[in-house]
Regions:
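Cofactor- and metal-binding active-site motifs of prokaryotic enzymes
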Residues: 1-139
Length: 139
């Protein structure tokens, strides 16, 4: 497995996501999984539109928050990307709605979607929205 990490605090959303992605993918190669972390100071649609064509067949997961905690600072503006690549990496993703109103249902639907991928074991990352309080019920 190869891992690439990239970060940018460029003012423009498209420039920031491109810089972060290129720094990450130059180390990892074509990603099977891309983790995207952004701050709320950016146009999230522009970030998404810019990034999606570049991840190829890989999957995307992540979230937007008020800051990104780095090794030496907390960044109130930035885009962080972690890319994972390797022939042995298999990725499935599931995006669920209504976590707050139906946490058990959201968890069940996510589990069913992940099981339908055919993978028998793996690691699950959960990125709920910041306003959800029922994450334990979902899990």
């Amino acid at each position: 497995m190869k891992v690439g990490i990239g970060f940018s605090d460029a003012r423009n959303a498209e420039d920031a996501v491109l810089e972060a992605f290129l720094n990450a993918v130059n180390v990892s190669g074509e990603p099977a999984m891309t983790f995207l972390f952004t701050t709320d100071s950016y146009d999230q649609e522009a970030i998404y539109r810019t990034l999606m064509p570049r991840i190829g067949k890989g999957r995307l997961g992540g979230f937007c928050g008020g800051g990104i905690i780095g090794r030496s600072a907390v960044h109130i503006q930035g885009v962080g990307i972690c890319t994972l690549s390797g022939d042995e990496i298999k990725v499935a993703t599931s995006l669920q709605k209504n976590l707050s109103s139906d946490p058990e249902g959201a968890g069940r639907r996510a589990g069913e979607a992940l099981l339908a991928s055919g993978m028998e074991s793996g690691t699950v990352f959960v990125f709920p929205d910041g306003f959800s309080t029922d994450v334990p019920e979902m899990i």
